[in-house]
């Protein structure tokens, strides 16, 4: 299931787009396409758009590696993506339910993290109970 919601949030006027797809590599193209479309709205260069697409793909692949493979309560396991569009930046926050509370993302020195750090201006990760998330921010050059 894919769900897209666009809304204005708060007084700052940031646009927020929420997208949830089945936690499967087959659906990463949907997230890459959404990323490219939103980055184009901010007038990122073609190289910057491609960098963001690759970064989102890598972040999602890292999350899928530790995602739960069986749904809880009969629902489909989902990879959720929250895009926040400001005047000068795009922030992408992707989350998945964990296979177990002991699951961890790769170490910060890993090749995957080096790729993310090179492609995005800010990168952070959270593992909270039964959910893991990666946040990427790319700013438009002034």
Describe the role of every protein-language-model region.
Residues 54-56, 120:
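Hydrophobic aliphatic residue packing
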Residues 59:
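Hydrophobic residues in the alpha-helical elements that line and stabilize the ATP-binding pocket
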Residues 1-18, 62-142:
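Conserved beta-strand-loop-beta-strand hairpin that lines the nucleotide-binding pocket
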Residues 1-54, 76:
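Bergerat-fold GHKL ATPase/HATPase_c domain
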């Amino acid at each position: 299931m894919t769900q897209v919601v666009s809304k204005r949030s708060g007084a700052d006027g940031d646009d927020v787009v929420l997208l949830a797809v089945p936690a499967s590599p087959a659906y990463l193209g949907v997230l890459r396409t959404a990323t490219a479309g939103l980055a184009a709205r901010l007038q990122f260069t073609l190289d910057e758009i491609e960098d963001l697409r690759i970064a989102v793909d890598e972040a999602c692949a890292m999350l899928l590696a530790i995602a739960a493979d069986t749904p809880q309560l009969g629902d489909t396991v989902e990879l959720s993506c929250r895009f926040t569009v400001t005047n000068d930046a795009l922030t992408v926050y992707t989350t998945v339910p964990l296979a177990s509370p002991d699951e961890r993302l790769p170490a910060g020195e890993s090749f995957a993290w080096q790729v993310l750090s090179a492609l995005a201006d800010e990168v952070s990760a959270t593992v909270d109970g039964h959910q893991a998330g990666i946040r990427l921010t790319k700013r438009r050059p002034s």
